């Protein structure tokens, strides 16, 4: 009995509140010479903060790169002249090097590469058409690979980082209009470009070499009835996989996830799982809404049909323990705001609202071994699809870290059954000075940095309770969970 009691106590101790300590803070005065700070963690190598000079001269202004240690101590500062109209577009970390993409409305771009090991900056200049998008940026073998849409034409772009030269592979299919072709995702694996391309109602896998020459094109969905909405290619161990979302209807959002091995450039043992068949998928909803969904499910089942919810999912790369495979997806939906100007109604996109995440374990045949869903609510709605959860293998178990409203969350899932064996949360304290309070915080963002460390940053109005002094700053605060 005593042994059983000790085991229960030990198990309960794993679900606890953790202490988050403010272990570093950087502040930039609101009226300083630089603005539009971009916070870019480089794993455990440090932190980069880039910003743009407010003043310009002869059409040029300075772009500053500051590099901080993990202790938030300034190590190096460097500035380069850029065209006045350039703005931050995207960033990628590859092999420990941070690549920042700056773009201008006329189509020109600059790629700024910062190496934390040498503190050196190199730049690549180039031009791209004004109306061309740059999606799914990947850095590999001295090149930037991306997908793009220009005048209803989709293409794969390859930029040489040494010369700035751009090469493009335009994607065409016989008897298919270019406007009905769209690159869902592209990545580089083993020096080969893999692109998943929507072609009308089908999805093709395209393979290209690093010069843009096409190596093959296979229709992945010729023999399946489901419509693939999103998909990504991963390599785990020595096997390739495709995961993403699907729908059984011709229109609307996704109604479930799929998992398949990629063998000989074709689906092998593809399996589909309705969101509502997953464990706790609706737990984030109110009791009233859950009950409503259950009634609709029962009604559909009596009619011999399957009820489904429409959702979008930001899928992560597949992880493996060497035997089985783990899928992580973050559920979100677009939010629109409606305003009236006179008699005219204007609808504008307000960002993506993230609600919860799904962690699932599959065997190589695509069979679902277990799944867990948990709520997550970031502090802001991003204007683009991104990942808020950081995932890694901790031994054989799966470790997830993320921010949920004003909390820092760490969850450890047991490999065998998906049960949470360690669940730690901590409230975010805004400053490390007990005499100061944050009265206002705008454009707040938070993300996992490395280990058990997080960053929270945004524009703040801080008040000192003793002196009554107020100051407006852009602040970056580091939290370490204990």
Task: Identify what each model region corresponds to.
Residues 1-25:
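Bacterial Sec-dependent N-terminal signal peptides
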Residues 26-63, 84-90:
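Beta-strand-rich domains and repeat architectures in extracellular enzymes and scaffolds
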Residues 30-40, 83-92, 127-141, 176-186, ...:
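Repeated scaffold domains used in trafficking and secretory/extracellular systems
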Residues 39-40, 44-58, 94-105, 135-151, ...:
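Short beta-strand elements that form the blades of beta-propeller/WD-repeat-like
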Residues 63-70, 111-117, 156-162, 202-213, ...:
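Beta-propeller blade signature
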Residues 71-110, 121-134, 175, 217-227, ...:
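Blade-loop segments of beta-propeller domains
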Residues 203-324:
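Long, internal scaffold/assembly segments composed of regular secondary structure
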Residues 218-230, 274-294, 299-310, 370-390, ...:
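Conserved blade-ending motifs and adjacent loop-strand segments that build the rim/top face
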């Amino acid at each position: 009995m005593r042994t059983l009691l000790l085991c229960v106590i030990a198990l309960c101790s794993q679900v606890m509140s953790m202490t988050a300590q403010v272990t570093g803070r950087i502040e930039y005065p609101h009226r300083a010479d630089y603005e539009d700070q971009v916070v870019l963690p480089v794993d455990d190598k440090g932190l980069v903060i880039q910003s743009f000079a407010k003043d310009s001269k002869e059409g040029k202004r300075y772009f500053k790169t500051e590099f901080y240690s993990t202790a938030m101590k300034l190590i190096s500062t460097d500035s380069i002249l850029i065209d006045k109209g350039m703005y931050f577009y995207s960033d990628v970390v590859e092999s420990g090097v941070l690549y920042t993409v700056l773009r201008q409305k006329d189509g020109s771009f600059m790629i700024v590469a910062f190496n934390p090991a040498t503190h050196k900056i190199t730049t690549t200049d180039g031009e791209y058409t004004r109306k061309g998008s740059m999606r799914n940026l990947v850095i590999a073998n001295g090149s930037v690979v991306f997908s793009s849409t220009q005048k209803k034409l989709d293409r794969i772009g390859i930029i040489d980082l040494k010369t700035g030269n751009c090469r493009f592979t335009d994607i065409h299919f016989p008897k298919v209009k270019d406007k009905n072709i769209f690159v869902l995702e592209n990545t580089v694996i083993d020096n080969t470009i893999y692109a998943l391309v929507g072609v009308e109602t089908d999805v093709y896998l395209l393979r290209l070499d690093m010069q843009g020459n096409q190596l093959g094109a296979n229709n992945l969905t010729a023999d399946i009835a489901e419509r693939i909405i999103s998909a990504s290619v991963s390599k785990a161990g020595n096997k390739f996989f495709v995961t993403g979302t699907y729908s059984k209807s011709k229109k609307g959002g996704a109604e479930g996830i799929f998992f398949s091995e990629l063998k000989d450039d074709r689906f092998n043992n593809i399996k589909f799982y309705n969101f509502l068949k997953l464990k706790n998928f609706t737990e984030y909803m109110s009791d009233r809404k859950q009950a409503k969904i259950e009634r609709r499910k029962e009604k559909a089942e009596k009619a011999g049909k399957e009820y489904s919810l429409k959702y979008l999912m930001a899928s992560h790369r597949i992880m493996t323990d060497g035997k089985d495979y783990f899928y992580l997806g973050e559920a979100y939906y677009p939010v629109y705001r409606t305003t009236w100007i006179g008699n005219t109604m204007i609808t504008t996109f307000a960002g993506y609202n993230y609600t919860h995440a799904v962690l699932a374990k599959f065997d190589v045949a695509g069979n679902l071994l277990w799944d867990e869903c948990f709520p997550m609510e970031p502090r802001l709605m991003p204007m683009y699809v991104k990942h808020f959860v950081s995932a890694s293998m901790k031994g054989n178990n799966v470790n997830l870290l993320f921010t949920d409203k004003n909390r820092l969350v760490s969850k450890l899932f047991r490999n065998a059954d998906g049960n949470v064996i360690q669940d730690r949360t901590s409230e975010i304290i805004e400053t490390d000075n007990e005499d100061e309070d944050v009265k206002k915080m705008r454009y707040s963002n938070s993300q996992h940095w490395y280990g058990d460390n997080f960053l929270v940053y945004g524009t703040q109005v801080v008040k000192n309770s003793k002196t009554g002094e107020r100051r407006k700053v852009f602040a970056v605060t580091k939290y370490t969970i204990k």
